[in-house]
Amino acid sequence: MSKSLNLEPIGKINGTVYLPGSKSISNRVLLLSALAAGKTRLTNFLDSDDTRYMLEALKALGVRYTVSKNGTCCEVEGVNGPLNTPHPIELMTGNAGTVMRFLTAVLSLGQSDVVLTGGARMKERPMDPLVDALRQGNAQITYLEKKNSPPLRLRGGFRGGNLTLRGNISSQFLTALLIMAPLAEQDTAIEVQGFLVSKPYVEMTLHLMRVFGISVTHKHYRTFNIKAHQKFKSPGHYRIEGDATAASYFLAAAAIKGGCVRVIGVGQKSIQGDVQFADVLQKMGAFIHWGEDYIECRPGRLKGIDMDMNSMPDAAMTLATTALFSEGPTRIQNIYNWRLKETDRLSAMSAELRKLGAQIKEGQDYIEIISPKNLKAAEIQTYNDHRIAMSFSLMALSDMPIRILNPRCTSKTFPDFFQKLAYLSGTV
């Protein structure tokens, strides 16, 4: 793919999309399968940059797996316990937060000597809530460059015990502790301090741990108790549901300029919080129909909305660009953790929305958007952030073209996104 992509105005969106596998689920079940006893066959697996970093790390740690030629099926042979390596190694996690954070916890078990590093942005992202919690359980962790951020040196040592974790930065930290704690020497109790962000992702983690035979008790998502010496057990086969955040772009496109779009792979039984974005569109005026494994959207007269989007911060970016096609202001609240993602998303989204003529008020944890009477053609800087690229592709639904810089950044989670968008628009 070239350094930029010109999207011509799209007249209408219509059709059916089969969603790629969820990135969040794919990387969780990859790790759970590696820790489990037995072989696990993962279908509708997501082949993307983030899952490849997880696979490469697992391979370096001695985990055996095979991936089908089309990349959608992965078979993992579990090691039936903690991941260890007899020699010091360095693992690259790219900009995959799930890989960096989950492995930081899991590799704090045992006595391995591992360095975890990442890309430039990963080296700026916070790790201290997780590292502080792991150190309470005797984990031996050293910051190698900048305090509180990767790269990290891990020398095992985690035993369990009573841990406190700040919950206001990322739910990935809690997920990391939950996944590793069943393999600890002692029972583990985790107390979440402050507000727990992105709680649906923790619910997803607990669901998947149950699938792999692990029991966790909790009280209102404030305290978690995990028994030691548990064993992960392979379910044999696990089908990964479609990516709900990916669905948000196509559902929003239908709300703006349908037609009718049906996304297949998520529905009433989805374990992902981002499926609730369909409810947000309905509140704005779109028409939504739910099936067991699909969601349909038809257009309506969209109105601005005031929403707390803490439970689905990724889909909140889709809301920000959808707001440009609605009447009245839109306010997206409680999204401070946008600032800690692949880029400072609050600043980046504000800057790019202003290019299009929108009136923007940016706060520490919110953004207010007022659409202009006439959108302006613009060149969108993506900041190497896949979600910015995909969110701003919706601007092609206006009457003017849009240029997306570095469109390849979508390979992080959705390599063929633009092909699927073109299919729905009838341009392929």
Curated annotation (Swiss-Prot):
Residues the record lists as binding phosphoenolpyruvate: K23, G97, R125, Q172, R345, R387, K412
Enzyme class: transferase
EC number of this enzyme: 2.5.1.19
Record keyword Magnesium present: no
Keyword Transferase: yes
UniProt cross-references to PANTHER family, sorted A to Z: AROM/DEHYDROQUINATE SYNTHASE (PTHR21090), PENTAFUNCTIONAL AROM POLYPEPTIDE (PTHR21090:SF5)
Enzymatic reactions: 3-phosphoshikimate + phosphoenolpyruvate = 5-O-(1-carboxyvinyl)-3-phosphoshikimate + phosphate
Active site: D314 (proton acceptor)
Family statement: Belongs to the EPSP synthase family.
Complex formation: Monomer.
GO terms for MF: 3-phosphoshikimate 1-carboxyvinyltransferase activity
Keywords: Amino-acid biosynthesis, Aromatic amino acid biosynthesis, Cytoplasm, Transferase
Any one of the GO BP annotations: chorismate biosynthetic process
Pathway assignment: Metabolic intermediate biosynthesis; chorismate biosynthesis; chorismate from D-erythrose 4-phosphate and phosphoenolpyruvate: step 6/7
Function per UniProt: Catalyzes the transfer of the enolpyruvyl moiety of phosphoenolpyruvate (PEP) to the 5-hydroxyl of shikimate-3-phosphate (S3P) to produce enolpyruvyl shikimate-3-phosphate and inorganic phosphate.
Compartments (UniProt record): Cytoplasm
Name of the molecule in the record: 3-phosphoshikimate 1-carboxyvinyltransferase
Binding site for 3-phosphoshikimate: K23, S24, R28, S170, S171, Q172, S198, D314, N337, K341
